[in-house]
């Protein structure tokens, strides 16, 4: 039975692994008390209040606070970026894009803005723009600023499934012993994580599969396993598949797994 090391992420901005808005790092523990490092502009107490609201899983209050800052200081990079973050958590994709693109215009060299643009474009259904930003993040991870190189991955998307929320994480390199490519964290409305779904392709299984499917393996395909871990310790092997680790195809499989294997008390239907 497989078990990967969990990254205990809080409800706002994937708090326990945050290196910046929607990027995963190694030593971050929460939303900082001041505007994110590298972001210009001082929003005063209202900006701090909004960040506290994000940390407390109150994105609507946070968005209101950031919008108040932007009324008097529309070019505040931090407020625009954090307003986009709050809009992503509220599944308001077009609004998230509006604020993230404004932040990028004001501070085009800041890689953390691109991590937010990925989730914003995903929420707005803008797949071409989303994938452009994903490719850019991979380039910056290899050649960019130190925090970009230290990050392990980033949030691709937040999407609702019933009353719950799913945070979809993509890793720059397969993570851990079992080579996790994607991780989907399922959260209750209060932000509590109730399930983790990992998309993995470990070398042992891959070797056996490649021996049986040499042509596919030579073309770069792999065998993957989708495994769920509930917070009560139960593990479910949902399915196996072979091919490329395409996010959109995997998302469909994960949503189907959540619908087919609901947790007690959850409302799994209705994912979009």
Model-derived segments and their meaning:
Residues 82-83, 116:
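Canonical tetratricopeptide repeat
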